[in-house]
Amino acid sequence: MARMHTRRRGSSGSDKPVADDPPEWSDIDADAIEERVVELAEQGHEPSQIGMKLRDEGVKGTPIPDVKLATDKKVTTILEEHNAKPELPEDLRNLMERAIRLRRHVDENGQDMQNKRALQNTESKIRRLASYYRGDELDEDFTYSFEVAVELLEAEEA
């Protein structure tokens, strides 16, 4: 698949192995995994970071290669059930952080055309994602602007 704002090809990667059951060596109880997921979320980790920590560190020393196979739930579903879900979806939040950084850079360096273009592309991605999440994760009348992004991220950190 191609990249969104360039003519280059996307990067290919290996596929996840097809498996219906977790490996025998990873026999941790699903409740213990859920507790660890909530604990990591309360420490401020995002869902993707939680998955990597469980893969690398595991629960009680045993790595968890795939949370969904071990618990039959995604990390975000577990967080929803325990009311630890972040206010903004992770991908949208990361794009907003990037747009804020770029906007502040472009305000200081008005001659930087490459980063002006990068800001335009990032804001386009945000608007596209916002239309996807609108109504479910975001308010029905949500429209992106720099001020709204700053306000949302400051409210989330507080």
From Swiss-Prot:
This protein's UniProt keywords: Ribonucleoprotein, Ribosomal protein
Cited Gene3D superfamilies: 4.10.860.130, S15/NS1, RNA-binding (1.10.287.10)
A GO BP annotation: translation
Ribosomal protein recorded as keyword: yes
Name of the protein in its database record: Small ribosomal subunit protein uS15
Biased composition (Acidic residues): 21-32
Subunit structure: Part of the 30S ribosomal subunit.
Organism: Haloquadratum walsbyi (strain DSM 16790 / HBSQ001)
Domain of life where this protein originates: Archaea
Entry's family note: Belongs to the universal ribosomal protein uS15 family.
Ranges where the record places region Disordered: 1-66
Pfam families: Ribosomal_S13_N, Ribosomal_S15
Biased amino acid composition, Basic residues: 1-10
Cross-referenced InterPro entries: Ribosomal_uS15 (IPR000589), Ribosomal_uS15_arc_euk (IPR023029), Ribosomal_uS15_N (IPR012606), uS15_NS1_RNA-bd_sf (IPR009068)
One example GO MF annotation: small ribosomal subunit rRNA binding
PANTHER family: RIBOSOMAL PROTEIN S15P/S13E (PTHR11885), SMALL RIBOSOMAL SUBUNIT PROTEIN US15 (PTHR11885:SF6)
SUPFAM superfamilies referenced in this protein's UniProt entry, alphabetically: S15/NS1 RNA-binding domain
A single cellular component GO annotation: cytosolic small ribosomal subunit
Ranges annotated as biased composition (Basic and acidic residues): 33-45
Disulfide pairings: none
